[in-house]
């Protein structure tokens, strides 16, 4: 299964950028309150709607960071299931679909344990100093569950889009 990820935040950034879905422009939302940096390029899967009402979040493992607004053709290898102050906030872990350096990564257990721990640690602590924000439970699941969530998020998006057209 392949899909497009729109990068909002490149790896190594503390700036939290978000795409304004009405204008398509990129807005600086805030600087992270903690001294942590994004451990991978971070953005969302196009034409999806996650449980939190936003597009489904995605991280892309790359050799080099890209830039806000970059579109990457990806495939899922796993997902970090987490809950924040607004509810379910899953993060799909992806690799570029056509990168031969990532060909061997097919499922979550193919991602180095340290890389998984680094990503997990980031999401467990990145909101720690922000008033009113929190991260609750979190765990890794494999590619099959990630792809099922992508399909469910596409269906949510299509239902919402169809519902909006009727009203």
Over which residues does each language-model region extend?
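Hydrophobic N-terminal alpha-helices or hydrophobic patches in metabolic proteins across all domains
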Residues: 1-167
């Amino acid at each position: 299964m392949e899909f497009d990820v729109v990068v909002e935040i490149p790896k190594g950034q503390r700036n939290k950028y978000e795409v304004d879905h009405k204008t398509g422009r990129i807005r600086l939302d805030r600087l992270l309150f903690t001294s942590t940096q994004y451990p991978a390029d971070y953005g969302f899967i196009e034409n999806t709607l996650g449980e939190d009402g936003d597009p489904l979040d995605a991280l892309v493992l790359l050799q080099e960071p890209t830039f806000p607004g970059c579109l990457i053709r990806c495939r899922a290898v796993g997902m970090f299931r987490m809950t924040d102050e607004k509810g379910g906030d899953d993060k799909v872990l992806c690799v570029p679909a056509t990168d031969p350096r990532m060909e061997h990564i097919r499922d979550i257990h193919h991602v180095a344990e340290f890389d998984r721990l680094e990503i997990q640690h980031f999401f467990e602590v990145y909101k720690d100093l922000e008033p009113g924000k929190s991260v609750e439970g979190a765990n890794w699941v494999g590619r099959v569950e990630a792809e099922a969530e992508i399909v469910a998020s596409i269906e949510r998006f299509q239902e919402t889009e169809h519902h909006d057209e009727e009203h």
